[in-house]
């Protein structure tokens, strides 16, 4: 046999580290994120395909150890053995190793066996190092795991290969193991030995283990969070970059009369009402289930557990498509304090998450609590906007959005930390969730596409108060209404008034600086540009140089879409590789014709590119070929070999 070469993973949509994708295997295609029900090869009685399983996982070691199952698997194949015609992943016996301390098979033997029975995705025999062990023991076992992963490549023939990330609760070892595995020619990466963390609700440590691993894994390879089968965890895990989950929980919990839900777990004997609207919950009452024989009751509860689990996977995929995954995460994490603690821990990894966060999304940003202030969108905005504020700031309380349309033309009643006089002042609205909003940017995503409760919580007040104090270190005056709202007392009164009208040219220049970097505004928009407004909305729509279109201001997010003249100006005025995606010779003629750019043809790009950025498509000599919208971030563009990377808007340069 030869390696099945059509394996493919393609990213279809993104929200932070979360992504939906297509995983193509020899026995079919899987939509990710995906849940893999665990199938017991000898006693499976539950239908998993009906509720939604596109891929399953079974234990090759159990098959190997049972003479009857082994003979049937070798003669008929694992698909016929477990009666599932879709993709099958097999485990190598690592679970038994972690439970019993020893197993009766060597790594080469179990790798060959998985290949011989026709599994789609096999797994090397890693060492599942438990949480809390010494650094010395953990590194020794990581080295064994790495050696076995390398060895597995030699023995596998046709199947795809899992290489498991280990490292216990030592983030440095997780990163080390992941970085070494990333160098190997394997296809997927489980993140292992995390079940004890989940069982004991140690979600903060789980976040460290997962994100330390993901930080070093290639974006082109799906990541499998091993043993994560409870639906209350799916949203958080996907937001950390996990694509696959396996669930034995659906049947194990059913054995104990426990029903899964996204809010937690219900014991059947405590229920007065059934918890969801699946067929089991609508057809039976708790008392009716309690009156059944044990096997029938177990099967029905398992069916419910599968339905609620697959429903949550579908909801997570839709949330990624809509761009509101983090709102779902914040909702789910309020099901348990330890889960919320884990989510809060993610704020320690904002620089990692920011690399994968799209620049613009189709959904608004909702402030649902103080955790929202730790989201990457807020982190990114504050980092960028402070570069563009300049000096002499007038900080004002929020009004109805867009602020620039609802504020009075002139505002009086300001105070300051030091005596101030004269003008002009740059007007900055101070408001949740983004804190600092210059009027020139009040129609730009995500500042305009956000909402927060009118009654602030204490964390929100302190967040805004801290920003105001930081800005008062320079020349700043503060609206008395804002001082009152935030409980700030300032010694000096400013007796003048502040002009709030925003000049159109100032607006488009600042948007360009915010979007493309400092200096882009004057580069794109000289003093003689012509600005057109929409007849319907009155908002800026097009910016021209004579009759040549420089940019369109997109109505949905207030960001700039490059026209032909804008692309030429940005290309001439910036050095390679700024805002560029370079394609090879094979792709060049297609890009010139306006065809989309696929990841496998990209030879270089600007490391600062994020999904939904406007980009310049060039060849190896930096000749401008076309413009387009990035669908992937820079790291994904350079790593993936499948799928669209840039949706080309205009070619023919």
Swiss-Prot record:
Residue ranges annotated for the PUA domain, each copy included: 578-653
Record keywords: Glycosyltransferase, Metal-binding, Transferase, tRNA processing, Zinc
Positions bound to Zn(2+): 276, 278, 281
Gene Ontology molecular function terms on file: pentosyltransferase activity; RNA binding; zinc ion binding
Cellular component terms per the entry's GO annotation: cytoplasm
Catalyzed reaction equations: guanosine(15) in tRNA + 7-cyano-7-deazaguanine = 7-cyano-7-carbaguanosine(15) in tRNA + guanine
Keyword hit for Transit peptide: no
GO biological process: tRNA wobble guanine modification
Gene3D superfamilies, per the entry: ArcTGT, C2 domain (3.10.450.90), PUA domain (2.30.130.10), Queuine tRNA-ribosyltransferase-like (3.20.20.105), Uracil-DNA glycosylase-like (3.40.50.10630)
Cofactor annotation: Zn(2+)
Pathway listed: tRNA modification; archaeosine-tRNA biosynthesis
Binding locations of substrate: 126, 193
EC number, as in UniProt: 2.4.2.48
PROSITE patterns the UniProt entry points to: PUA
Biological function: Exchanges the guanine residue with 7-cyano-7-deazaguanine (preQ0) at position 15 in the dihydrouridine loop (D-loop) of archaeal tRNAs.
Protein known as: tRNA-guanine(15) transglycosylase
Organism expressing this protein natively: Methanothermobacter thermautotrophicus (strain ATCC 29096 / DSM 1053 / JCM 10044 / NBRC 100330 / Delta H)
């Amino acid at each position: 046999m030869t390696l099945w070469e059509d394996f493919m993973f393609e990213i279809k949509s993104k929200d932070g580290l979360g992504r939906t994708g297509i995983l193509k295997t020899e026995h079919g295609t899987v939509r990710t994120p995906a849940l893999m029900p665990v199938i017991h090869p000898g006693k499976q009685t539950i239908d998993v395909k009906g509720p939604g399983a596109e891929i399953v996982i079974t234990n090759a070691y159990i098959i190997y150890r049972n003479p009857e199952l082994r003979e049937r698997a070798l003669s008929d194949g694992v698909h016929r053995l477990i009666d599932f015609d879709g993709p099958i992943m097999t485990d190598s016996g690592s679970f038994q190793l972690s439970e019993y301390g020893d197993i009766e098979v060597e790594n080469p033997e179990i790798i060959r066996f998985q290949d011989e029975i026709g599994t789609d995705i096999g797994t090397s025999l890693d060492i599942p190092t438990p949480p809390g062990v010494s650094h010395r023991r953990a590194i020794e076992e990581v080295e064994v795991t790495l050696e076995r992963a390398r060895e597995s490549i030699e023995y596998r023939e046709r199947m795809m290969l899992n290489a498991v990330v280990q490292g216990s609760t030592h983030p440095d070892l997780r990163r080390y193991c992941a970085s070494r595995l990333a160098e190997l020619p394997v296809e997927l990466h489980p993140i292992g030995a995390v079940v004890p963390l989940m069982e004991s609700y140690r979600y903060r440590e789980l976040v460290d283990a997962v994100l330390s691993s993901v930080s070093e894994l290639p974006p082109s390879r799906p990541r499998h969070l091993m043993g994560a089968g409870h639906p209350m965890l799916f949203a958080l895990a996907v937001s950390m970059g996990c694509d696959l989950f396996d669930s034995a929980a659906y049947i194990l919990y059913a054995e104990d009369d426990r029903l899964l839900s996204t809010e937690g777990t219900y014991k059947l004997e405590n229920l007065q009402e059934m918890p969801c609207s699946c067929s089991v919950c609508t057809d039976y009452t708790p008392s009716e289930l309690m009156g059944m024989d044990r096997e029938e009751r177990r099967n029905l509860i398992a069916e419910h557990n599968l339905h609620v689990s697959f429903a949550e996977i579908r909801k997570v995929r839709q949330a990624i498509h809509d761009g509101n995954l983090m709102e779902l995460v914040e909702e789910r994490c309020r099901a348990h304090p330890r889960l919320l603690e884990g989510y809060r821990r993610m704020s320690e990894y904002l620089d990692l998450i920011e690399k994968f966060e799209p620049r613009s999304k189709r959904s608004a940003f909702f402030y649902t609590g103080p955790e929202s202030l730790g989201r990457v969108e807020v982190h990114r905005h504050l980092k960028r906007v402070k570069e563009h504020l300049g000096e002499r700031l007038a900080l004002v309380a929020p009004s109805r959005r867009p602020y620039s349309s609802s504020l009075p033309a002139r505002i009086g009643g300001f105070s300051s930390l030091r005596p101030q006089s004269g003008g002009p002042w740059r007007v900055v609205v101070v408001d949740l969730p983004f804190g600092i909003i210059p009027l020139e940017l009040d129609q730009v995503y995500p500042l305009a596409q956000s909402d927060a409760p009118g009654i602030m919580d204490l964390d929100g007040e302190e967040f805004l108060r801290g920003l105001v104090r930081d800005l008062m270190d320079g020349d700043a005056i503060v609206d008395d209404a804002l001082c009152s709202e935030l409980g700030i007392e300032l010694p000096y009164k400013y007796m003048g008034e502040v002009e709030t009208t925003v000049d159109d040219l100032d607006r488009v220049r600042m948007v360009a600086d915010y979007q493309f970097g400092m200096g882009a505004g004057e580069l794109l928009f000289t003093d003689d540009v012509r600005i057109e407004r929409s007849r319907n909305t009155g908002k800026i729509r097009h910016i021209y140089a004579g009759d040549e279109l420089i940019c369109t201001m997109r109505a949905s997010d207030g960001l700039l879409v490059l026209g032909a003249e804008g692309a030429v100006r940005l290309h001439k005025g910036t050095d390679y590789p700024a805002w560029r995606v370079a394609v090879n010779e094979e792709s060049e003629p297609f890009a010139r014709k306006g065809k989309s750019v696929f990841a496998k043809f990209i030879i270089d790009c600007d490391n600062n590119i994020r999904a939904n950025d406007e980009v310049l498509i060039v060849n190896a000599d930096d000749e401008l070929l076309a413009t387009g919208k990035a669908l992937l971030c820079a790291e994904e563009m350079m790593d993936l070999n499948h799928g669209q990377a840039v949706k080309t808007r205009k070619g023919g340069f």
